[in-house]
């Protein structure tokens, strides 16, 4: 809704990383290993990708970050680069709900169609509604991986709420 209303692109580091993984780039291969183990890709890689992306023409009138920044270093790098934010939104969801939602997700890789075993099940269990092909659970949606990612979130990302609430001056969210 926001991207359509303002005519701006959504910038998702997760989508950018998945595209690199699918393409089999060196960054993609490195990222896949880290993500599959429940870790976060190094800040320097993410920051570089984001800076490159927001320099593109379709971002000249703005953009919507999705899942970025995730660490204090990423947030500070954006401030240092002069990237001003109009607003920062935190969506607070209990860990148990996140684990349930992510670990129940199933994907048809060829099309990207996404299902959920409880909330959006396919017509035939484990099969894509359109093609009848198998659905898979991505490695990063497996319960133990989701729990590891949540632990990393609590350690590295929760501090951003405090960072943005205290940010002052020209770079503070308006």
Curated annotation (Swiss-Prot):
GO CC terms in record: cytoplasm
Region (NMP): 12-41
Localisation per UniProt entry: Cytoplasm
Record keyword Transferase present: yes
InterPro entries: Adenyl_kin_sub, Adenylat/UMP-CMP_kin, Adenylat_kinase_CS, Adenylate_kinase_lid-dom, P-loop_NTPase
UniProt keyword list: ATP-binding, Cytoplasm, Kinase, Nucleotide biosynthesis, Nucleotide-binding, Transferase
Gene Ontology MF term list: adenylate kinase activity; ATP binding
Pathway given in the UniProt record: Purine metabolism; AMP biosynthesis via salvage pathway; AMP from ADP: step 1/1
Enzymatic reactions: AMP + ATP = 2 ADP
GO biological process, any: AMP salvage
Class of the enzyme per the UniProt entry, highest EC level: transferase
SUPFAM superfamilies: P-loop containing nucleoside triphosphate hydrolases
EC number assigned by the record: 2.7.4.3
Residues given in the record as AMP binding sites: 13, 18, 39-41, 67-70, 74, 138, 149
Principal location class: cytoplasm
Binding-site list for ATP: 105, 114-115
Annotated spans, LID: 104-141
Domain of life, source organism: Bacteria
PROSITE patterns tied to this protein: ADENYLATE_KINASE
HAMAP family: Adenylate_kinase_Adk (MF_00235)
Stated role: Catalyzes the reversible transfer of the terminal phosphate group between ATP and AMP. Plays an important role in cellular energy homeostasis and in adenine nucleotide metabolism.
Matches recorded under PANTHER family: NUCLEOTIDE KINASE
Family: Belongs to the adenylate kinase family.
Subunit annotation: Monomer.
Domain-level remarks: Consists of three domains, a large central CORE domain and two small peripheral domains, NMPbind and LID, which undergo movements during catalysis. The LID domain closes over the site of phosphoryl transfer upon ATP binding. Assembling and dissambling the active center during each catalytic cycle provides an effective means to prevent ATP hydrolysis.
Name of the protein: Adenylate kinase
Protein species of origin: Neisseria lactamica
Name of encoding gene: adk
